[in-house]
Structures are given as C-alpha cells and as structure tokens.
C-alpha cells in the first residue's frame, strides 16, 4: 500500500517472503494507525473479532488504543489494504498507517528512506527453521 510507511523487508528470496506473508504461518505484523475520529472500545473489539472484507472474514487480531485518534493492531494475515478496509467497515478513515514490527524485527529509530541489514540473530529469530540464508 503506497500510502503506508514503516518496516518492510527487501529480499531476493521469494520463498522467505511467502513464508512470512502466509496467514497459516502466523507471523505477526504490528501497525500503528491514526484515524479520523476517536477510537472507541466498540471499534477495537470489532476489529479484534474480525471483519468481512474481500468476501471473507479477517482472522481475529490484537488491538489496543494508543491515543484518542490512534490504535495498535497486530495481524497474522496480510490482505490487500486490510486495515483500511477493516476500519472503513466501522466508518473510520485511516489517516496514517505505519508498520512497526514483523515478528521479532522492530522498526526502531529508522527514518523513512533509511535501511540496514538484518543481523544473524534477527534472521534466525524470524524463521528459525530456515538455514539457507
């Protein structure tokens, strides 16, 4: 989603990307989201239960309020524009969407446009069963 920002993994190994993105592998992706109106408990509960988008129900997820107009959501699936569509189902509009974590990898202090290589420890933590790095 070009209107989003934050942590992204760049690799030439498509198998690794597919392993991370497949919902059945339960890799967590955490986002911080700013919306156009106050975040309510009802909204957070509804998002956490799952929402019908793209003719399917999203998987249950974790949510928490970060600010009056902001929340955190942790997904294990990655449907196209998932958070925007889930929010829209409750009449919320996403104003800012930032991925801050993929499993054990955290965005930390990296600014837009900055990058760094993963450490061996991070690689092993991300996909411990893989040995072909």
What are these regions (language model features)?
Residues 2-133:
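Basic, flexible Lys/Arg- and Gly-enriched helix-loop patches that mediate nucleic-acid binding at interfaces
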């Amino acid at each position: 989603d070009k209107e989003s920002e934050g942590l992204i993994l760049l690799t030439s190994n498509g198998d690794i990307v597919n392993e991370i993105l497949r919902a059945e592998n339960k890799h967590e992706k955490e986002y911080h989201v700013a919306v156009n109106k106050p975040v309510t408990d009802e909204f957070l509960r509804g998002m956490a239960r799952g929402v019908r988008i793209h003719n399917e129900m999203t998987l249950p997820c974790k949510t928490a309020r970060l600010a009056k107009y902001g929340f955190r959501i942790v997904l294990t699936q990655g449907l196209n524009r998932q958070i925007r569509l889930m929010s829209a189902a409750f009449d919320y509009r996403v104003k800012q969407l930032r991925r801050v974590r993929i499993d054990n990898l955290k965005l930390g202090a990296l600014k837009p446009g900055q990058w760094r290589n993963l450490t061996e420890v991070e690689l092993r933590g991300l996909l411990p069963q893989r040995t072909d790095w």
